[in-house]
C-alpha cells in the first residue's frame, strides 16, 4: 500500500479507497439478502431468478473495483466480457420472473387468449395496435433472449478484435470494431427493453400485486443507464474533453471516473434490491423469521436489564443462528444449486429456435398452399371457359369415350379429343375439349363413395348441394369428398384430393 501512495496521484488513491468502501458495502448487503432468500427458500421458481438478479450488484461492484485497481489494462478486458455476459443474463431472468408471477407459461397462454386489442408501447402506440395472442409470448421471449445471446457474443468478438488491433475503446472510426459493436449492442438492448415494457403493459393488471415497476426500474438502471453512462464517458474521451494528469491521460481518467461511479451506484442498487426484492414475501413462519434475525424475542422476558439477562439474550441469539443454519442448510444448498444451473436458459434457447424453425416451415407451407389454391382457381376458371367453348361440329365418335361416375370401368377412360362427364343419377353432363388444355388430366370422383355404392345416391346429391353453397369452406367441411386425378395418357390414379363439387377439372 505504501508503494501505491508514493507512486500514484492523490485523486487515484481517493477513488480507489472510496470505491472499495462502496463496493464492499454492496457485496455485504447483497450476500445478506441472498442468504435470507436461501433460508426462506419456499418458492424456488421465483427465488432462483431473484437471487440471480440480486447478484448483478456485487458482480458489477467487483468488476469495477478490479478494473479500477488494474487501471483497465490487460485483465480489464476479461472483466468486461464476464460483466457483459451476466448483464444480459439478468434481463432474461427478470423476464422469466415476470412469467412466474403470472403463474407459469400455461397460465400466461391462457391469459393471452382473453386479451383485447391494445396499442403498442410508446411511441409506436400512436400509430399501431395489436391483439396479444399466444405467439406474443414466444416473440417476447425470443427478443429478450436475443440480447442474452448477442451481448456476450459481441464481448467475445471484441476480445478477438482487440488482440488483432481492430478494437480500441473510445475509437469511433469506421475501421475499428468499437463503433459497430456499440451500435449493435445498443439496438439489441433497445429491442429487448422495448418488448419487456410491452410485456409488462399487456399484463399490467395481473402483475400489479407484485410491484413490478420498481423492480423494472432497478433492472433498467443497471442494464440501460450504465450502458449510456459508459458511452457518454467514451464520447468525452473521444473529444478529449476530460482533464489530464502528469501520470495518466484523459482516456485513463475517464475510465477511472466510470469505474468509480459504478462502485457507488452498485451500493445504491444493492439497497434498492433489498427493498424491491425482499425475502419477507417468502417467509411462511413469522416466529422462525424472528429467530433467524436473532432478535431474542422468545427469551426477552428473562431479566431484561440485568447482566445475566443480557448474557442469556446474547447466547440465545448465537444458539438461534446456529440452529437455523443447521435447519436451513439444505435450503441453502438447493438454492445454490438452482441459481448456478443454466438449464432454463439453454432449454428456452432450444425451444425458441425450434419454434422459429417450425414457423418458417409453416409459413412456407402456407405460401405453397396459397400458390396451389391460386393455380386451382385459375384451372377451374379455364375449365369453365373450355366447357363454354364446345364446338357445334363435334364428331359423333368423340362422344363415345366419357367418364361416368356411376361406373368403375377404367377402360372407358381412354384418351379422346372430347370427354363427356356425367353426374351420378343425373341427366346433366358436360364436355371437355382436350385441345384447349395444356395437360390432359382430369379430376373425377365421388361424394361418400357414390360411384361405388349406389345406395347412397340421395345423400350424395344433398352433399353436392351443400358443397355448392359452402365453396369457401370446402377444405375443412368436405372431408368425405374424395376425388382422384387421372392422367389420361397413362390412365393411372395420381393422388387424392378434397374438393367441393362432384365435377372439377384441372389440366
Swiss-Prot record:
<keyword id="KW-0813">Transport</keyword>
<dbReference type="GO" id="GO:0022857">
    <property type="term" value="F:transmembrane transporter activity"/>
</dbReference>
<protein>
    <recommendedName>
        <fullName>Transmembrane protein 184 homolog DDB_G0276041</fullName>
    </recommendedName>
</protein>
<feature type="glycosylation site" description="N-linked (GlcNAc...) asparagine">
    <location>
        <position position="477"/>
    </location>
</feature>
<dbReference type="Pfam" id="PF03619">
    <property type="entry name" value="Solute_trans_a"/>
</dbReference>
<feature type="glycosylation site" description="N-linked (GlcNAc...) asparagine">
    <location>
        <position position="470"/>
    </location>
</feature>
<feature type="transmembrane region" description="Helical">
    <location>
        <begin position="222"/>
        <end position="242"/>
    </location>
</feature>
<keyword id="KW-0325">Glycoprotein</keyword>
<keyword id="KW-0812">Transmembrane</keyword>
<dbReference type="GO" id="GO:0016020">
    <property type="term" value="C:membrane"/>
</dbReference>
<feature type="transmembrane region" description="Helical">
    <location>
        <begin position="13"/>
        <end position="33"/>
    </location>
</feature>
<feature type="glycosylation site" description="N-linked (GlcNAc...) asparagine">
    <location>
        <position position="498"/>
    </location>
</feature>
<feature type="compositionally biased region" description="Low complexity">
    <location>
        <begin position="451"/>
        <end position="500"/>
    </location>
</feature>
<keyword id="KW-1003">Cell membrane</keyword>
<comment type="function">
    <text>Probable transporter.</text>
</comment>
<keyword id="KW-1133">Transmembrane helix</keyword>
<feature type="transmembrane region" description="Helical">
    <location>
        <begin position="179"/>
        <end position="199"/>
    </location>
</feature>
<feature type="region of interest" description="Disordered">
    <location>
        <begin position="448"/>
        <end position="500"/>
    </location>
</feature>
<feature type="glycosylation site" description="N-linked (GlcNAc...) asparagine">
    <location>
        <position position="473"/>
    </location>
</feature>
<feature type="glycosylation site" description="N-linked (GlcNAc...) asparagine">
    <location>
        <position position="360"/>
    </location>
</feature>
<feature type="transmembrane region" description="Helical">
    <location>
        <begin position="88"/>
        <end position="108"/>
    </location>
</feature>
<feature type="transmembrane region" description="Helical">
    <location>
        <begin position="260"/>
        <end position="280"/>
    </location>
</feature>
<comment type="similarity">
    <text>Belongs to the TMEM184 family.</text>
</comment>
<keyword id="KW-0472">Membrane</keyword>
<feature type="transmembrane region" description="Helical">
    <location>
        <begin position="141"/>
        <end position="161"/>
    </location>
</feature>
<dbReference type="InterPro" id="IPR005178">
    <property type="entry name" value="Ostalpha/TMEM184C"/>
</dbReference>
<dbReference type="GO" id="GO:0005886">
    <property type="term" value="C:plasma membrane"/>
</dbReference>
<feature type="transmembrane region" description="Helical">
    <location>
        <begin position="50"/>
        <end position="70"/>
    </location>
</feature>
<feature type="glycosylation site" description="N-linked (GlcNAc...) asparagine">
    <location>
        <position position="375"/>
    </location>
</feature>
Amino acid at each position: 500500500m505504501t508503494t501505491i501512495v508514493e507512486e500514484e496521484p492523490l485523486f487515484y488513491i481517493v477513488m480507489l479507497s472510496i470505491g472499495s468502501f462502496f463496493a464492499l458495502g454492496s457485496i455485504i448487503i447483497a450476500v445478506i439478502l441472498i442468504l435470507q432468500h436461501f433460508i426462506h427458500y419456499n418458492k424456488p421458481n421465483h427465488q432462483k431468478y431473484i437471487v440471480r438478479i440480486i447478484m448483478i450488484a456485487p458482480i458489477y461492484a467487483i468488476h469495477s473495483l478490479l478494473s479500477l485497481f488494474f487501471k483497465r489494462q490487460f485483465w480489464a478486458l476479461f472483466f468486461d466480457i464476464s460483466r457483459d455476459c451476466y448483464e444480459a443474463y439478468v434481463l432474461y431472468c427478470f423476464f422469466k420472473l415476470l412469467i412466474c408471477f403470472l403463474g407459469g407459461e400455461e397460465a400466461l397462454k391462457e391469459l393471452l387468449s382473453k386479451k383485447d386489442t391494445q396499442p403498442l408501447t410508446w411511441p409506436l402506440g400512436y400509430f399501431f395496435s395489436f391483439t396479444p395472442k399466444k405467439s406474443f409470448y414466444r416473440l417476447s421471449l425470443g427478443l429478450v433472449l436475443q440480447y442474452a445471446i448477442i451481448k456476450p457474443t459481441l464481448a467475445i468478438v471484441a476480445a478477438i478484435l482487440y488482440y488483432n488491433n481492430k478494437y480500441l475503446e473510445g475509437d469511433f472510426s469506421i475501421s475499428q470494431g468499437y463503433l459497430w459493436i456499440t451500435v449493435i449492442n445498443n439496438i439489441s438492448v433497445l429491442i429487448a427493453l422495448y418488448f419487456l415494457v410491452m410485456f409488462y403493459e399487456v399484463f399490467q393488471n395481473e402483475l400489479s400485486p407484485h410491484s413490478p415497476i420498481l423492480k423494472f426500474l432497478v433492472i433498467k438502471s443497471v442494464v440501460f443507464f450504465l450502458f449510456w453512462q459508459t458511452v457518454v464517458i467514451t464520447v468525452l474521451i473521444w473529444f478529449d474533453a476530460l482533464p489530464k494528469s502528469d501520470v495518466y491521460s484523459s482516456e485513463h481518467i475517464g475510465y477511472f471516473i466510470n469505474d468509480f461511479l459504478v462502485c457507488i451506484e452498485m451500493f445504491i442498487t444493492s439497497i434498492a434490491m433489498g427493498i424491491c426484492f425482499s425475502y419477507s414475501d417468502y417467509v411462511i413462519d413469522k416466529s422462525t423469521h424472528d429467530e433467524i434475525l436473532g432478535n431474542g424475542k422468545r427469551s426477552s422476558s428473562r431479566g431484561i436489564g440485568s447482566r445475566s439477562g443480557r448474557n442469556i439474550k446474547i447466547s440465545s441469539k448465537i444458539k438461534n443462528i446456529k440452529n437455523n443454519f443447521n435447519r436451513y442448510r439444505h435450503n441453502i444448498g438447493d438454492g445454490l444449486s438452482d441459481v448456478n444451473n443454466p438449464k432454463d436458459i439453454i432449454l428456452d434457447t432450444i425451444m425458441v429456435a425450434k419454434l422459429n424453425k417450425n414457423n418458417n416451415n409453416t409459413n412456407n407451407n402456407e405460401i405453397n398452399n396459397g400458390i396451389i389454391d391460386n393455380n386451382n382457381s385459375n384451372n377451374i376458371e379455364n375449365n369453365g371457359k373450355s366447357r363454354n367453348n364446345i364446338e357445334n361440329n363435334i364428331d359423333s365418335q368423340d362422344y363415345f369415350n366419357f367418364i361416368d361416375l356411376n361406373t368403375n370401368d377404367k377402360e372407358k377412360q381412354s384418351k379422346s379429343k372430347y370427354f363427356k362427364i356425367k353426374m351420378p343419377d343425373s341427366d346433366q353432363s358436360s364436355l371437355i375439349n382436350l385441345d384447349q388444355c395444356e395437360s390432359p388430366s382430369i379430376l373425377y370422383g365421388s361424394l361418400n363413395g357414390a360411384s361405388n355404392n349406389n345406395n347412397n345416391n340421395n345423400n350424395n346429391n344433398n352433399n353436392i348441394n351443400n358443397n355448392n353453397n359452402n365453396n369457401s369452406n370446402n377444405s375443412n367441411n368436405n372431408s368425405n369428398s374424395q376425388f382422384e386425378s387421372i392422367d389420361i395418357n397413362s390412365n393411372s390414379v395420381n393422388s387424392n384430393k378434397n374438393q367441393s363439387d362432384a365435377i372439377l377439372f384441372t389440366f
